[in-house]
């Protein structure tokens, strides 16, 4: 596994005074000497506590976990490997070796699978349903069974992170990273980990409905360039289905009750036609994307061949 001297532990935080001290201590006890706490402007003393326990503390320029991660890696980390965890005490520092080991085996990104060993009470039933639905949807769109794309326990090379196109500000950062890894064929491993219940006295910053909606929208938005057939096809299918249902309603009203609905009939035809066009556009976009990827593969192969000749 990577030498500890080549690893920075990244802990994005916001008002985690109840847990950050023990979290930093655990990673220091695990042998890490560079622990970066990237704080989003905590008002409960998180920064002071982290500093007292030996962490390097930086305040991000704006709010949100996504901004914290991007700013930390791009501006405050220069080591080759990054081990990222939450500062809420739900991840075990003693499992750092399992997280880092795949990076020595050719993988560039590692995701900790919380569902492999989840402590009772660590995740609400609503959050479990949302996580499972997100993971299922991700696998359908991107064809990669990453198991737990919303996990906050990650290990990755700094070089691979710099290749990702990331823009999410909040909790959508994990989804965005997973999508980018799948899109760019970055070798990604999934490692079973233990997920603990939050320590008593600490409060989560996650809002299930609000943040869940943001995550779903981010996942769907990213499908536009990763799987356009799904993106346009799903909208087209919905539009076409709506048009067909309207047509059935108009037909029944006309033949059974003799009531005409000319305006609804026009709307039905328009909705159905739009649906068909969107599906066709999705098929064409998917074809163009496949051709684009083939061209990129050829260019990379030629570059490797010429590089070998040198």
Spans of model-derived segments:
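Acidic metal-phosphate-binding loop of nucleotide-sugar-dependent transferases
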Residues: 89-91
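A conserved acidic beta->alpha catalytic loop
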Residues: 39-47
């Amino acid at each position: 596994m990577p030498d500890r001297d080549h690893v920075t532990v990244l802990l994005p935080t916001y008002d985690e005074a109840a847990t950050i001290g023990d979290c930093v201590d655990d990673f220091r006890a695990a042998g890490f000497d560079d622990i970066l706490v990237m704080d989003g402007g905590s008002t409960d003393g998180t920064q002071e506590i982290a500093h007292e326990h030996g962490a390097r503390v930086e305040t991000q320029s704006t709010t949100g976990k996504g901004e914290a991660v991007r700013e930390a890696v791009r501006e405050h980390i220069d080591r080759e490997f990054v081990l990222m965890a939450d500062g809420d005490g739900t991840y075990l520092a003693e499992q750092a070796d399992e997280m880092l080991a795949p990076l020595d085996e050719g993988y560039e990104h590692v995701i900790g699978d919380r569902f492999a060993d989840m402590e009772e009470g660590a995740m609400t039933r609503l959050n479990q349903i949302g996580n499972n639905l997100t993971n299922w949807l991700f696998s359908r769109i991107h064809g990669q069974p990453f198991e737990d794309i919303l996990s906050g326990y990650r290990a990755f090379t700094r070089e691979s992170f710099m290749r990702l196109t990331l823009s999410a500000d909040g909790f959508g950062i994990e989804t965005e990273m997973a999508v980018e890894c799948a899109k760019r064929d970055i070798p990604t491993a999934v490692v079973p980990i233990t997920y603990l219940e939050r320590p008593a006295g600490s409060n989560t910053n996650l809002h299930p409905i609000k943040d869940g909606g943001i995550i779903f929208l981010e996942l769907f938005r990213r499908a536009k360039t990763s799987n356009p057939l799904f993106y346009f096809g799903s909208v087209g299918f919905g539009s076409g289905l709506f048009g067909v249902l309207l047509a059935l309603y108009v037909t029944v009203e006309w033949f059974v009750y003799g009531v005409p609905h000319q305006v609804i009939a026009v709307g039905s035809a328009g909705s159905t036609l739009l649906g068909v066009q969107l599906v066709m556009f999705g098929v064409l976009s998917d074809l163009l994307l496949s051709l684009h990827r083939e061209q990129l593969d050829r260019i990379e192969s030629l570059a490797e061949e010429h590089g070998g000749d040198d």
